[in-house]
Amino acid sequence: MNILLITNDWKPKTGGISTYLRSLVNNLDHKFIIYGPSWIEGDDAYPAEDTFIINPRKVFEDIQKIVNDNLIDIILHGSSNPNFLFVNKLNTLNVPNSPKNVKIPQYMICHGAEFNVLNYIPVVRNLLSRNLDNLNTIFTVSEFSRKKLSDITDTEIINIGAGIEIPNYENNYENNVPLIIGVVSRLVSRKKISWLIDVAHDLKEEGLPIELKILGFGKQENYLKKLSSVSAVNVTFIKDETEKDVDDFYRSINLFAMPSKSKYFGVEFEGLGLVYLEAASYGLPVIVGASGGAIETIIPGKTGFVAGDKNILKESILYFLNNPEKIQEFGLNGKKFVEEFYSWEKLIINLESNIESIK
């Protein structure tokens, strides 16, 4: 099957959606053509000439040519924004060489806040709904996102979840003192990394052995570094450069925590949180935020905890400081949970069966 993936999230861009789509392409045994903004990279990439959003007519002409030149069977939209703008126009395209002028099927993967924010903009809401209604099927990464979308569109919505590449790594759980807490994240306010610094500071002031490692970059980087500079706890900042850097990071920590919080009264939320699953795949206990689909990435009390505020975050970290043997128990439970419910093999089977059944 020849699949045209239209996306605003592709290498060299980083982030959860970009990581998800690259892994999807690597694991799906079909030919992919990638169409996106002028800066996308790759052997099968077709960068637009700076017209991806500002010139929809040129976008349509580009896609029409790609579809015909590459005998595209289906169009897969990598996310809802800005792709919802193209759906209705692309519904005029036929499957190449189709004797019956069959319309080319369109599918979309929706993640979380990228569609929910649009739904709260009055001018955009109706346009979003009308375009989503013209898709064959919408796939979501979490049950939370599926339920949110069901209020926006009548199109069939299927939660396919996420997939994680399980690392070839066995955690020996031998060095849990000091407790090294890690977070992999964009450094933005919604991730509440400042909470981690504040709580770690308080625990260090109480004489407990604790350190904090932060991997990522973003708007709050300078603010968080200033906060760390007056903290009692040792905070290390790392910028992710390669997959090996991320791999080494997960191997160097004992506990993963990212207490994300929804913003604007729930308009912007965590669609799922791939980093929670990545951390669990390394055999780490995980503390998630009470935001969107994040709570679907753990089994509370068995693989991690949900921290909706700083007090609960502190209690959750204290649990592992006071019960170090639970680090291994929770970590092993978490790795088993990810292997059972978040393998790429299961996701691909689910995705392909639903695409094939509709074609």
Question: Where in this protein do the model-derived segments appear?
Answer:
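Nucleotide-activated donor-binding/catalytic signature segment of Leloir-type glycosyltransferases, i.e.
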Residues: 224-247, 255
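Short hydrophobic beta-strand element within catalytic cores of glycosyltransferases
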Residues: 276, 280-281, 285-288, 298
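A short, well-ordered alpha-helix in the C-terminal region of glycosyltransferases
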Residues: 319, 326-341, 347, 353, ...
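Conserved donor-binding/catalytic core segment of Leloir-type glycosyltransferases
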Residues: 6, 174-191, 197-201, 213
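Short His-centered aromatic/hydrophobic patch
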Residues: 77-83, 110
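Conserved acidic donor-binding segment of nucleotide-sugar-dependent glycosyltransferases
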Residues: 299-311, 319-325
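Donor nucleotide-sugar binding/catalytic pocket of nucleotide-sugar-dependent glycosyltransferases
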Residues: 108, 133-169
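Acidic donor-binding loop of glycosyltransferase active sites
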Residues: 251-269, 284
